């Protein structure tokens, strides 16, 4: 790839700046050089030399300042990206020893993007530098007076060790701006070179600073040779001189600080590590608010004012990097000082970068790049707090990825203890000796309190038992501040008493607790960067509104306060107060902490304004946007309630408890009780018993609120300045009173509002109780009795077949009784809109044929005896049966003795008659069926004897009549027609039967009904046997007897109880009887007239027609003739001789069809009604009833029409008759029906008309037309 020199733009200098080298570019042969080089043309040798110079590697420029326009070797951790961003405008020179690095996208490095954009703007505004390369200065993007430079000695310790191992040169440095892709690679290199890193970690502090000073001096001297550069070098020299002065002061004050610490060791007492829940997800205060407050607080003065007098290094504890978009990218004062300040490598400081990552020596690999951790450089103990905090952050995220809490705790505690063990504890003490250095470092590193809080909260989230031992602390006053604030310096060190490793913690000043609680509620404007992940964010800002105290006593007057299981303590005036956070105590975490407070109660009281406390609670609740709103409000209200209750129970000094937001994992409980009771509080033992109940209840409540597996591990830091109105303690306790039962003997003190509310609830519950009175019981008894009577009445109506009465039925006699309670207009309304659905029933009404009271009148199963039949037994079986009793005779019959006895011998007639009668009267249906089987087998066996001159026995007409008469059928029902009567009458039938059975026994035996219900099994058994007899012996009955049997069967089929029973056996017997009639053509008309007289109801007549089988020729003929006879009867026509020819029958059917008009039938009925009752007028109800009857009759007539037309095969000659029938059906019947939604019977009739018309159309289509005629034309009626 070659590069060309582009022509200079108008207004752009065409010659390079003085002292700069000409630009490296290729020139075409014959082209002119720039104006500065003259107008000569280059020779081929010059061109070759220029090409060589172009590809010649450039000299190392790693000693230039960041502000230098030349290309610097300070890279983004080996990525090859220059800080000045000049790589965007020229091609990089590749090194043979180093692979070409990757470019960092602007999304991953917002600083680089801002630098590149700034480079373009600088290029447009100020032209080019002397090397014709666009340059830019970092001072443009920094605050006024701020300089930026990052010496190599302040890189992370592990990075320095890895570079020493790899390059063996202390002057090869990398930029502090770290890229995401190379961080993991360096972590792997650190793991491989862990042994060498430990050896190289013992490098002396003087050597490291010697390399730093050499690098700084080289950069400063180099920057003087470049005119036009910024004053960054001069500023840096001032910073360097200030630092060396600080180092000299530290060395001079080592011994003094060590002696003072040793003097305070005598007053220290053993305590445990404080695992207080602190500000996980602390919010940073807005920059403009803190800047105003910093000016008002003298304690937050600038470092340069105290040490150097340099105003460019102003620092504030709440300053942090704020990224407000890609267009605005400025360094804060804190960031500037961190980049320009000098820190020794020995103390393992944590570096802050503009990128979204923070790397430390102990930072785990799984910290995401989106996290922004605001930490500071403080004393050695605070550094370890931050290290532990970052470890716990990594552990917290590991837990969220599925790793158990216990394994995560063991992981990071092992790493921390291994590093702590190798530390030189004496050097840790020496670093914090001088008071001036402590003050300076305290101002620079004020966020250490938040780091300690994060360590405590993260240790709580592990739920592992940690048994620390406290270390002594000392009180140090700050005379240079106007507030005279004293601070407890908290140390975390390692002691080995008895060979056991213990983490030791020094109690903190209550003032620090107030600062931390205030810092927890301060929102951060930069929190939107960390809201996209679930990691805990450590804020570097603290709230400046600290509690002012007049003075504090000496360290010798301090007393230790233990943590115990009580959450609330009633302390009188002057009692020792504590501001430790109280959270639910987990049974498996026996942790405790010691807190140093003065014994002087007057000086120890720390009043906290109620307004600040409410603001803190409000902001705490608004800071956690990842939780649901209901859970968030409930938790905040619970915390507020506990705080108010604990403060309200203190009589003299208020016990102010400050609560930080809950940790990601369920925190361990740390509670405070005084280990040494105060002399001024003799009633602590008594008050502790009263407070145990409330404490235990609150523990359970907190445990239910916080011990959840669904707790989120991250919190958002979006600021929410709105304050919500909190409910009072009485309201909250009233809501939760039912869910917090007391465990102690004394109930907890309930407020007045709570007592009043509970009393109201009790009164409401008592008012809603249900009480029985005498009047109510009497009323219930009456209602129950009335319902029982109604139920009995309904059952009786159903038993009698009347059904359930309804006022919707019109025309019924019972409906008027039910509607007596209704008004007349209501009754008329019901009649008008009532729907009539039962005008045309689906089944025929039937008749009562069997009278069960007369059943068994002639004989029964107990009077029938084979010995009284005159039978004389010859075989052994017959003798055995004759010797047996009545019951044994039936038993031997059913067991097959008679079948075996008469297998080869003719059965005597008395035995067959006895079996036939016993089968008809026996009440046991199983026995009746067995007897039928025996009787049929014997009959069939007797028919096989062809050599016998006697026909097998078949029951005579009198035997059949006697059996049915004994079942309860009257003699008139058996023979209903007067013209067709048998040779015997009822008296003869009874006398003959009694003679055969023995008259004495029958007379002496008492009479009692045999059947209480229809003996359908017995009836069907008799019909089956008759069917067998008519089949075996067709000539057994004469034509007259056959006709009487047919009429008998038709009459018995009208029985109401037989409507739901399929009468297949009846039809089989009818087929045999019709087939056995010898003179069929003569007898068919007489049979039709006799069947037509069996009933007067049209629907019963239709049932008789449908009972005739139509699968035989005689059956179809009987159906046709019977239908025509019935139609003539129903239409009041004269009985004429039924023509035998089919064509004539269809012609007669057309004449009847014209008379089936519903309106004409209604007129006839009305006239008939008036003739019968001339004095009565026909009202609407009667007219409606007559209309129902007319449509009912039309329905029956149409069915009979269908039976006539569809009961035989038709020829092509009958086609024209069916065409005429279709026309008459549509004209006279279909067109006369007016359907109504309330009159369903009309629709039912019209439906039947459509079905019949469809059948006729099918017949017409199947018939062949007349010769020479293709279509049927309409012919008008004559």
UniProtKB/Swiss-Prot annotation:
Protein location: Nucleus; Nucleus, PML body
Enumerate composition-biased segments (Acidic residues).
707-724
Keyword presence, DNA damage: yes
- One Pfam family recorded for the sequence: CANIN
Family matches, as InterPro entries: CANIN_dom, FAM178
- Among the record's GO biological process terms, what is one? DNA repair
**Keywords per UniProt:** DNA damage, DNA repair, Nucleus, Phosphoprotein
The family assignment reads: Belongs to the FAM178 family.
User: Quaternary form?
Assistant: Forms a heterodimer with SIMC1. Interacts with SLF1 (via N-terminus); this interaction links RAD18 to the SMC5-SMC6 complex. Interacts with RAD18; this interaction is increased in a SLF1-dependent manner. Interacts with SMC5 and SMC6.
User: What does this chain do?
Assistant: Plays a role in the DNA damage response (DDR) pathway by regulating postreplication repair of UV-damaged DNA and genomic stability maintenance. The SLF1-SLF2 complex acts to link RAD18 with the SMC5-SMC6 complex at replication-coupled interstrand cross-links (ICL) and DNA double-strand breaks (DSBs) sites on chromatin during DNA repair in response to stalled replication forks. Promotes the recruitment of the SMC5-SMC6 complex to DNA lesions. May play a role in SMC5-SMC6 complex recruitment for viral restriction.
- What is the name attached to this protein's record? SMC5-SMC6 complex localization factor protein 2
- State the encoding gene: Slf2
